[in-house]
From Swiss-Prot:
It is found in: Cytoplasm, Cytoplasmic ribonucleoprotein granule; Cytoplasm, Stress granule; Cytoplasm; Cell projection, Dendrite. Phosphorylation at Ser-420 by PAK1 promotes its relocalization to stress granules and activity. Phosphorylated by MAPK1/ERK2, promoting subsequent phosphorylation by GSK3B. Phosphorylated by GSK3B, promoting ubiquitination and degradation by the proteasome. It comes from Cricetulus griseus (Chinese hamster). This is RNA-binding protein FXR1. The modification Phosphothreonine is found at residues 401, 483, 611.
């Protein structure tokens, strides 16, 4: 601020020293020396520039001079106008012009100077220009020492930063300064930014130096990471280094990228070791027996993937036979793993345990094979353990013969073969089957006796329909009755069959729950046959509708039409149709309830086939 010095006229006529702070349209903002007066704006006509410093001091008697003095002790010294009255050596007797003529004072030569010839300032006496300061440089520009070289280059009287307008103020008494400021301002701001960056780096280096000196006596570890593993050690966007720095007690981590060396400093050995575990990545291999490689990998790599996930390694590679980078033992295949030291240790434990398990299992399997071989040599029956070996067609459980209910080997094709055999069987076989089926439980196992759409329903009135055909005078509505006594009788009768039909009864017992086509042939009293002797689905539907209508009729209507229904049943089995379950007389006589031998039945059928009309498919003539 001392660079732009002016003299401000006081109320007593003396000129006091001041400094220009800002230039306005018609005034100056002035700060007084030692702040004896507050900062204020002074008009141009009360301000003048001081005389040049190299002015010659040639003073003689009678000259007007200016005396550096003060009116009282409370005011500072100022330049007062006076006149020299006498000279004696270095002392001068002066008379103040502003005071009475009687007020004289003796002063020394140093307090005197010739009268200042400078006039009061005008509007074009001082020039001011401004430069906008970027936000990142405002703090640096607040220091006036940063503009020392710039001030000298442009010839300014003063350069300072104005915080309210965020601008640099350049004050000068020369108009050429404004042109130079416009030329050099950008360069000046760039130089400030560069200096600021260098100063910041120097400060960081100084702090690092101090920190290094302090850490030299603390705990530290140093390790080297291979160049191809450096990316894993650093982590994505330096995540591993950041994680290591967050370990409590770690003070600094340094990395020399040229040599791949990490240096960790900490307050304790445990903290340094823990931080090292995050960044120290290594590659190691484990030898696996060749015959166990497939089992170690697992189906679709499931086993080796589980080992990798649990251990924490990041990569696994199996070295090929044509690669000789690693030492290889006979009959062994190297598995190469990449990860931290801790994860490599984990994978070694997991893999060694799994290999030991596989070897033990292989040993047990070999012992089993030896035992089986010894059993075959002795001649005993084959051993059937709980392994995964195949079972032959003659396999037995070893605990007795297979029961009828525990033999699950019958397939759907065997059932169809059985049905086709029965459809082509003779009348004697059908009669035997008819007698056996009539003794079964009418509703099937665990099924309702109402004869609905369930799987056990159609068998409910099987034997009763045959009895109606043989005895038309009987009550046809007995088909709807299913008493407990009938079930008991059927159950008793079903247990008295001959042992020669044991296999066939076992098959039929398993298929009783399914509504098969053969059951429809023996059960229906109205169904017609096709060329192969099979009953169609339409026949089942018509029979179910007929039975449903019979059940829904009122009791009075049922009692009234009993005899008519019996006659209809007899007429349906007249000479116009072929009988399903046996031959009928050509004259339409009632069927005698007399049993015939199988030979008589066949002879009777041959005679009737020559005289009766050929049956049409589905019973339509």
């Amino acid at each position: 601020m001392a660079d732009v010095t002016v003299e401000v006229r006081g109320s007593n006529g003396a000129f006091y020293k001041g400094f220009i702070k800002d230039v306005h349209e018609d005034s100056l903002t002035v700060v007084f020396e030692n702040n004896w007066q507050p900062e204020r704006q002074v008009p141009f006509n009360e301000v003048r520039l001081p005389p040049p410093p190299d002015i010659k001091k040639e003073i003689s008697e009678g000259d007007e001079v200016e005396v550096y003095s003060r009116a009282n002790d409370q005011e500072p010294c100022g330049w007062w106008l006076a006149k020299v009255r006498m000279m004696k050596g270095e002392f001068y007797v002066i008379e103040y012009a502003a005071c009475d003529a009687t007020y004289n004072e003796i002063v020394t030569f140093e307090r005197l100077r010739p009268v200042n010839q400078n006039k009061t300032v005008k509007k074009n006496t001082f020039f001011k220009c401004t430069v906008d300061v970027p936000e990142d440089l405002r703090e640096a520009c607040a220091n006036e020492n940063a503009h020392k070289d710039f001030k000298k280059a442009v010839g300014a009287c003063r350069i300072f930063y104005h915080p309210e307008t965020t601008q640099l103020m350049i004050l000068s008494a020369s108009e050429a300064t404004v042109k130079r400021v416009n030329i050099l301002s950008d360069m000046h701001l760039r130089s400030i930014r560069t200096k600021l960056m260098l100063m910041s780096r120097n400060e960081e280096a100084t702090k690092h130096l101090e920190c290094t000196k302090q850490l030299a006596a603390a705990f530290h570890e140093e390790f080297v990471v291979r160049e191809d593993l450096m990316g894993l050690a650093i982590g994505t966007h330096g995540s591993n280094i950041q994680q290591a720095r967050k370990v409590p007690g770690v003070t600094a981590i340094e990395l020399d990228e040229d040599t791949g060396t990490f240096r960790i400093y900490g307050e304790s050995a445990e903290a340094v070791k823990k931080a090292r575990g995050f960044m120290e990545f290594v590659e190691d291999f484990i030898q696996v027996p060749r015959n166990l490689v497939g089992k170690v990998i697992g189906k679709n790599g499931k086993v080796i993937q589980e080992i990798v996930d649990k251990s924490g390694v990041v990569r696994v590679r199996i070295e090929g036979d044509n690669e000789n980078k690693l030492p290889r033992e006979d009959g062994m295949v190297p598995f190469v793993f990449v990860g931290t030291k801790e994860s490599i240790g984990n994978v070694q434990v997991l893999l060694e345990y799994h290999i030991a398990y596989l070897k033990e299992v292989e040993q047990l399997r070999m012992e089993r094979l030896q035992i089986d071989e010894q059993l075959r040599q002795i001649g005993s029956r084959s051993y059937s353990g709980r392994g995964r070996g195949r079972r032959g067609p003659n396999y037995t459980s070893g605990y007795g013969t297979n029961s009828e209910l525990s033999n699950p080997s019958e397939t759907e094709s065997e059932r169809k073969d059985e049905l086709s055999d029965w459809s082509l069987a003779g009348e004697d076989d059908r009669e035997t089957r008819h007698q056996r089926d009539s003794r079964r439980r009418p509703g099937g196992r665990g099924r309702s006796v109402s004869g609905g759409r369930g799987r056990g329903g159609p068998r409910g009135g099987k034997s009763s329909i045959s009895s109606v055909l043989k005895d038309p005078d009987s009550n046809p509505y007995s088909l709807l009755d299913n008493t407990e006594s009938d079930q008991t009788a059927d159950t008793d009768a079903s247990e008295s069959h001959h042992s020669t039909n044991r296999r066939r009864r076992s098959r039929r017992r398993r298929t009783d729950e399914d509504a098969v086509l053969m059951d429809g042939m023996t059960e229906s009293d109205t169904a017609s046959v096709n060329e192969n002797g099979l009953v169609t689905v339409a026949d089942y539907i018509s029979r179910a509708e007929s039975q449903s209508r019979q059940r829904n009729l009122p009791r009075e209507t049922l009692a009234k039409n009993k005899k008519e229904m019996a006659k209809d049943v007899i007429e349906e089995h007249g000479p116009s149709e072929k009988a399903i379950n046996g031959p009928t007389s050509a004259s339409g006589d009632e069927i005698p309830n007399v049993p015939r031998t199988p030979g008589e039945e066949k002879t009777k059928n041959l005679k009737e086939e020559s005289t009766q009309e050929a049956a049409v498919l589905n019973g339509v003539s």
